[in-house]
Structure formats: structure tokens, C-alpha cells
Design a protein with these regions (language model features):
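Conserved C-terminal helix/tail region of periplasmic/extracytoplasmic solute-binding proteins
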Residues: 383-439
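Bacterial signal peptide processing site
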Residues: 21-24
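C-terminal motif of bacterial Sec signal peptides marking the signal peptidase cleavage site
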Residues: 15-19
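Ligand-binding pocket segment of bilobal, Venus flytrap-like solute-binding proteins
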Residues: 226-302
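Hinge/lid segment of periplasmic solute-binding proteins
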Residues: 55-63, 126-174, 181-194
Length: 439
């Protein structure tokens, strides 16, 4: 997709940057609890001449635009870091960010920020990680009070006064409706877990870890929440169902990194994939298959499974870290960058460049003037309250995710096809042990 013009971004800065300070004392999340660099740390020198970003970040402190802003993120492919460095430089910002050959994944990003203690800003992650940061689970990661100009445009995707949504993603269940799939039959489920009784061949991932895999598990387990269950707040029937999903599903070993390939090749009728890359994958589907999926925005031989519950969304957020020894002018520069990056114009440009969907509703309107794509119109059960609790499902996932990971690891879920363990004796399991990390 074409890139938005740099001129538009500069104009945005002239109009909106000057009033990017502020803050709220609330730390309660409203929505929470929905590719070339060398592989080293990259620091871009800033071009400050005539830059609109040199305007004050708030009404009292002039930002130090010579300050190098250290950023941590898991949304850091080489394409993304290169784009961000170049666009930030054009706006007068110095930034330093590692690509994913140095830091890969949300766990690594958070751990590095916590251990290095040199971060000014963190973006990406998901509600689970942000909930942990907000709750103070990382000793060296504290957020400054901050409310951007665009805070009112991100809906419920915010931790008031602390962190604000920038990108929405979800997981999708897709199916072929040609002769390699349902042969014209439509699929309607009540829950994600109904796939195990669909009568069709489905793909399943081959490892426990990974953000997309975790989100698929969260979608599969949604119908089985039980706050009184010792099995990580999930009923035993839920774990039995997830086992069946593994046992009867097709993983393909290392041939499939994610679920698009097996569906695109016609090896399965149903698969799971993440929203942000889907349309780009379908555009290029014929490059890797003799039986490709066709019709990017108007599906020809595939569709979304109609699931009454909806799907599990996550949002990536941005927050300003409280860095020891940073001056007020340097902090003002960090806030100015965050204000700029989360603005409608920049998030629309980011979304167009990388096929992501912005939390910022004004950015979404710019990006999709003809209407929101179907994959982002699905109901979001991550924000539904879990019966018997005062928590949203996203918060419930954040609370129980370590237990779920331990259960799946200890029982051997998501094995390679030729290494299937025996099914557990579900009636005689010590859940108090299984929910703990072993070794």
C-alpha cells in the first residue's frame, strides 16, 4: 500500500503538537481487565531545522529536541523500525529502538526494559503485559501521568492517565468454502471451541508460546470460564476440549509458521490467523499455492466462520516510562513524540503501511473511508465481563495466563504430530501442581 505523504504528517504537527501535555491520576484501565536494519540498536539523528515538532510539548516546558528517546517495543520488525526512525527524524525527533533481531516478542521487550532501566517509552504489547506494568509487577517499569490530545478517540482502549491504545488486533477463524473446504456449506458456531465438533479438518498451532497462539487459546477457552475451578479458572471440560483441539487438529510441524499456509494450500478446511496480516497474505496467496485463497475484501473461496461469541481482541498501547534522571525538558520531548505517534494522521499512515487497524477512531476513518473491514466488525468478547467476577475477559486472561501456560506445558499440549503424549486422566489430576511452573 502507498505511504501517506510526509507533508501531511508535518501539517498535522503544526496543528496539533503544541498541546500534548496533561495527565490524570487514575490508573484504572477502562478497556482492560480487545521489514532494513543491521540487527543492532539504531539511533537516528534528528533534522531539527524548521520542524513543527520543536513546538512546546505542554504549556510550561520547552521539549529538548536534541534528546534521544529510547523506545522498547515488540512491534519492531525491521520494516517498522526503519519507517518509524525515518518519519520521526522528519519531525525532529531523535529515537533509538531495537529491531526484532535484538528484541523479539513482548516478553523480551518488557524484560529488557525492566533490566536495562534506560527506557523512555514503551509501545505495543497487549492487555496482559500492560496490566502487569500498571499493577507494578515490574520493579523498574513505572509510567508517568500523561493524557494525550487524542485520548478521547480511542474508546475503551485506555488506562486512564497512563497508557493509550494505538493498534487493535484480533484472531480469526477462517474456512474454505470451495471443494477443498466445506463445498459451499456455511459455518456457524456459538463458540470458538465448537470447531472440534465441526466435522471438518482444522489447523492447530504446534507450540504453547507466542502472542498469536496465546490469543487463540484465549478464544478457545472463553466458553469455559469458571472462577471457582482450581484448573486456572477454567472448567475441566474446557481443558478436555482444548486437548481435543490439539489431538484432532493438523499442525504440519515446521511447514506452517501460522495458520494461513495450510488453509491457502487446501490442507485444511478451517484455520486460525491474526487479523493484521490477513489481507496482505491473500493478495499474495497465489505465490505460495496452486490452490490459493481468492478475493481479498470480497471473498471468493473463503470466509470468516460466523461465531456468535465473536472473537478475542488485543490492543497495543503506548505509555511514557518514568526514567530516573531525565529532565523535565527531556520528558516533554518524550511526551511530544508519543503525542505525535498516536495522532490520527500518523496512526493512519502506520496502519496503511503495515496493514494494522488503529484504535484511534479518527485514524480508522481516514484509513477506511468506505467502511471498516469485516474482520474488525466482529464482536469483541475480550471486553465482556466474566460471570461471577467484576473483571473483563481480558483482565481474567491476564490474571490466569501464567497458570494456563503452566497447565499446557506440564500436560504436553501442542505437541509435534509424531510425539503425542497420552491423554491425561482428567479425573485424577493435581491442579495445584499443574498450575505451577515445573523445574
Amino acid at each position: 500500500m502507498k505511504k501517506f505523504l510526509s507533508l501531511a504528517l508535518a501539517l498535522c504537527m503544526v496543528l496539533s503538537l503544541a498541546a500534548c501535555g496533561g495527565g490524570s491520576s487514575s490508573t484504572t484501565p477502562s478497556s482492560s481487565p480487545a521489514p532494513a536494519t543491521s540487527g543492532t540498536t539504531t539511533t537516528a539523528p534528528a533534522d531539527n531545522s524548521g520542524s513543527a515538532a520543536a513546538a512546546p510539548a505542554d504549556n510550561t516546558v520547552q521539549p529538548d529536541m536534541n534528546y534521544t528517546i529510547r523506545i522498547y517495543s515488540n512491534s519492531n520488525s525491521t520494516e517498522r523500525t526503519t519507517w518509524l526512525i525515518n518519519e520521526a527524524k522528519a519531525e525532529g525527533f531523535n529515537i533509538s529502538i531495537d529491531d526484532n533481531s535484538v528484541i523479539s516478542g513482548d516478553t523480551a521487550a518488557v524484560q529488557a526494559a525492566n533490566e536495562n532501566k534506560d527506557g523512555d517509552l514503551i509501545f505495543g504489547l497487549n492487555e496482559t503485559r500492560w496490566g502487569q506494568i500498571i499493577d507494578g509487577q515490574y520493579e523498574n517499569l513505572k509510567l508517568v501521568d500523561w493524557t494525550p490530545e487524542w485520548a478521547g478517540s480511542v474508546g475503551n482502549y485506555k488506562y486512564d492517565g497512563k497508557a493509550y491504545g494505538i493498534v487493535i488486533q484480533n484472531v480469526l477463524m477462517l474456512y474454505r468454502n470451495d471443494a477443498l473446504g466445506t463445498n459451499g456449506a456455511e459455518l456457524h458456531f456459538n463458540h470458538w471451541a465448537d470447531v472440534v465438533n465441526s466435522g471438518y479438518k482444522w489447523y492447530r498451532q504446534n507450540k504453547v508460546g507466542g502472542t498469536t497462539n496465546m490469543n487463540i487459546n484465549s478464544a478457545m477457552l472463553y466458553a469455559f470460564t469458571d472462577p471457582s475451578s482450581p484448573a486456572g479458572g477454567i472448567s475441566v471440560d474446557g481443558w478436555k476440549t482444548l486437548w481435543k483441539f490439539c489431538a484432532d487438529g493438523v499442525s504440519g510441524g515446521d511447514d506452517y509458521k501460522y495458520g494461513f499456509d495450510p488453509l491457502n494450500k487446501g490442507d485444511v478446511a478451517i484455520s486460525e490467523f491474526y487479523s493484521s496480516a490477513l489481507y496482505g497474505k491473500i493478495d499474495a496467496a497465489a505465490d505460495s499455492s496452486s490452490n490459493p485463497l481468492k478475493g481479498t475484501f470480497q471473498p471468493e473461496n473463503w470466509n470468516l466462520v460466523d461465531i456468535k461469541d465473536g472473537t478475542y481482541y488485543i490492543a497495543e498501547y503506548i505509555g511514557v516510562l518514568d526514567k530516573a534522571g531525565r529532565s523535565e525538558a527531556e520528558t516533554a520531548a518524550v511526551k511530544a513524540f508519543a503525542e505525535w505517534f498516536g495522532s490520527a494522521e500518523v496512526q493512519a499512515a502506520w496502519g496503511e503501511e503495515f496493514d494494522s487497524f488503529p484504535c484511534n477512531e479518527d485514524a480508522a476513518d481516514q484509513l477506511y473511508p468506505d467502511g471498516v473491514p469485516a474482520i474488525y466488525q466482529l464482536p469483541n468478547f475480550a471486553l465482556n465481563k466474566v460471570s461471577g467476577t467484576d473483571k473483563t475477559y481480558a483482565a481474567y486472561v491476564a490474571e490466569h495466563n501464567p497458570e494456563w501456560t503452566n497447565i499446557m506445558t506440564n500436560l504436553g499440549f501442542y505437541w509435534a504430530d509424531n510425539n503425542a503424549p497420552a491423554e491425561p486422566d482428567w479425573d485424577n489430576l493435581d491442579w495445584s501442581t499443574l498450575t505451577q511452573k515445573q523445574g
